[in-house]
A protein has these predicted regions:
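Phosphate/pyrophosphate-binding catalytic cores of soluble transferases and nucleic-acid-acting enzymes
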Residues: 1-312
């Protein structure tokens, strides 16, 4: 059975489409989001609400303690167990999310960076980043993998550390690692549907509205509750978009509106990076929203794509 995947940048309606397809196909949703895995962070990560789920079971949401360094390798293993369980019950898995790296790791099934499931290499590299600084780590990447370094910004901590992680565990550059893993048959066959806005201004408005709704739903209270629970400020989860800015506001380092504006800006920048990543994948079938979302058109497009691949 092919997995149905709904991908796209933040704020483009993936949750809605994933639920609609799961209802139509008799399926269950598996979240593919690097931040929704954490407990107690439902508002800032835009985890689906009970109302949005419409009774459809959702997996890989709120499964990890935010103190943990939850790696992509661990996600791939945990999500695969969910997928296999859904398949064993004769149900259709619907993968929903915008984290392209996590999606690729789940579908490929041949590990990530050699399978650093315990996060040992990543934890060591994170510690070195804190002690030595980003410039030193970036210089190290330039020495061992100049090709990858040439495509990254000095401040792109996540991808710099990922490239170093791959090298130190496998002895290979990212290009070499990717070339080798592409030769291995994927764990799952899939049909991929992408959602995005045709006009950039429409995407901007959708993201801004999404952030406003998060704040209205209690984002700042959620962050305060995490702090009150004893969650350290420097854990990876608290550096996510929305949480870092909320911390600045709660600490008196930024005005409330300044924090909200910064969340909107970073969210738009993140959406742009998501699109750049996902558009590299020629297997994704894209549906572009006009200024007004016409839901039946999107559902008809998606249904036609699925029927083309024998999914019904």
């Amino acid at each position: 059975m092919k997995l149905v995947c709904v991908v796209g940048p933040t704020g483009c309606g993936k949750t809605w489409l994933g639920v609609e397809l799961a209802k139509m196909l008799g399926g269950e949703v598996v979240s593919c989001d690097s931040m929704q895995v954490y407990r107690g962070m439902a508002i800032g990560t835009a985890a689906p609400t009970a109302e949005e789920m419409q009774g459809i079971p959702h997996h890989m949401v709120g499964v990890a303690d935010p103190r943990e360094n939850y790696s992509v390798a661990r996600y791939a293993d945990d999500a695969a167990k969910c997928v296999d369980d859904i398949l064993s019950r004769g149900k259709q898995p619907v993968i929903v999310g915008g984290t392209g790296l996590y999606l690729n790791a789940l579908l490929a099934g041949h590990g990530f960076a050699g399978g650093d499931k315990d996060g040992r290499y990543r934890a060591e590299l994170e510690s070195r980043w804190d002690k030595e600084g980003g410039e030193a780590m970036f210089a190290e990447l330039r020495r061992i993998d100049p090709e990858t370094a040439g495509n990254l910004h000095l401040n792109d901590k996540k991808r710099i550390l990922r490239a170093l992680e791959v090298y130190y565990e496998t002895g290979k550059t990212m290009a070499q690692h990717n070339a080798e893993t592409k030769l291995i048959p994927p764990r799952y066959d899939s049909v991929r549907i992408g959602l995005a806005y045709e006009d950039r201004d429409d995407m901007k408005r959708a993201i801004d509205l999404r952030v406003d709704k998060m704040v209205e739903a209690g984002l700042f209270d959620e962050v305060r509750a995490l702090l009150d629970s004893g969650l350290p400020r420097d854990v990876t989860a608290m550096q996510a978009i929305g949480y870092k800015e909320a911390l600045a506001y709660l600490d008196g380092e930024a005005a409330r509106e300044e924090a909200i504006d910064e969340i909107k800006l970073r969210s738009r920048q993140y959406a742009k990076r998501q699109l750049t990543w996902l558009r590299r994948d020629p297997s994704i079938h894209w549906f572009y929203w006009k200024k007004t979302r016409i839901l039946p058109d999107c559902l008809a497009f998606s249904t036609e794509i699925l029927h083309t691949y024998g999914v019904s």
